Amino acid sequence: MSESVHTNTSLWSKGMKAVIVAQFLSAFGDNALLFATLALLKAQFYPEWSQPILQMVFVGAYILFAPFVGQVADSFAKGRVMMFANGLKLLGAASICFGINPFLGYTLVGVGAAAYSPAKYGILGELTTGSKLVKANGLMEASTIAAILLGSVAGGVLADWHVLVALAACALAYGGAVVANIYIPKLAAARPGQSWNLISMTRSFLNACTSLWRNGETRFSLVGTSLFWGAGVTLRFLLVLWVPVALGITDNATPTYLNAMVAIGIVVGAGAAAKLVTLETVSRCMPAGILIGVVVLIFSLQHELLPAYALLMLIGVLGGFFVVPLNALLQERGKKSVGAGNAIAVQNLGENSAMLLMLGIYSLAVMVGIPVVPIGIGFGALFALAITALWIWQRRH
């Protein structure tokens, strides 16, 4: 392990490769674990409305620890923070394997994910700079989406075979991520020596929130990414209930195949964004965001598998093109104002608050008996209107 604080800014440096591998394995575990645990809930006869609650306890950890994880990422070598966070994920997955309440185990994975996220994105600005940052984000998103693709499918397919095997595979993936983190160069902490008083940390985090919100560009990025990821997570759970109703298929694997189509599309869209969008032309991504909602609405009305695959892949392409430039904009502007770790922590608060709100509304809609197809139609229409409003606001300001 290198102790050097100097970095090779190449996109394919040793450190960047280690980050990408660690991110792939960690995200693979996250996505496989979601579908494996959903299969466990079905096997143990939990009610349908409890499924989004599983994700809500996960994102609740992000929100609870949001004031602190950004400072953790900036106060220590980010590679070591990533290793510790993946260790927590490993512990959470293993606890579910050994029969601990799945909601408690998944909460522990959420704590690890909360600590991991500011470090994984913040380290990109330390390993590469300038014009390569958007491309580095493209690599990170491509790695993440490839992991979503393979992890989601693996979780569903293995769960159809045996739930315990699926859960064990998740723990193994997290263990591999811990090992990959060892090979990330130990870089100097970005902002060492900060106070660890919880009150002052909370106050500092709120100051970072205020600073980013007052800046028009970072506020635009925060709202856009929050809407996107809140909608993306809700779509995942919508698919779990939509498949048996619209397609008449009741296995665990088919919703994961459909999620995989979104993942493939996001890889394509992220690559296109890296080539076609710069920090100076971020507004080019906005039409894609509006079209996401329109295509979700059309998708909800389908009753055949092949059109569903095609439309979900299109949703992914539009999503990748939409979110990658917004992520890069926030990292670049945030690094200069509040530090990359704090910027990503604020972003996580926004995104996970949106997820919590959207999942809560979705769970409530399912609980009161609204059919899943009308839920999907309303969901797509509201998302398109929200992104349209954001674009109008951005152009005026």
UniProtKB/Swiss-Prot annotation:
The chain crosses the membrane at residues 18-38, 53-73, 91-111, 145-165, 167-187, 227-247, 257-277, 281-301, 305-325, 344-364, 367-387. GO terms for cellular component: plasma membrane. One of its GO terms (molecular function) is lysophospholipid:sodium symporter activity. Residues 1-17, 74-90, 166, 248-256, 302-304, 365-366 are periplasmic. Keywords: Cell inner membrane, Cell membrane, Lipid transport, Membrane, Transmembrane, Transmembrane helix, Transport. It is a multi-pass membrane protein. SUPFAM superfamilies: MFS general substrate transporter (SSF103473). Residues 39-52, 112-144, 188-226, 278-280, 326-343, 388-397 are cytoplasmic. It is found in: Cell inner membrane. Pfam families: MFS_1 (PF07690). PANTHER family: MACROLIDE-EFFLUX PROTEIN (PTHR43266), MAJOR FACILITATOR SUPERFAMILY (MFS) PROFILE DOMAIN-CONTAINING PROTEIN (PTHR43266:SF2). Belongs to the major facilitator superfamily. LplT (TC 2.A.1.42) family. Catalyzes the facilitated diffusion of 2-acyl-glycero-3-phosphoethanolamine (2-acyl-GPE) into the cell. This is Lysophospholipid transporter LplT. The lineage of its organism: Bacteria, Pseudomonadati, Pseudomonadota, Gammaproteobacteria, Enterobacterales.
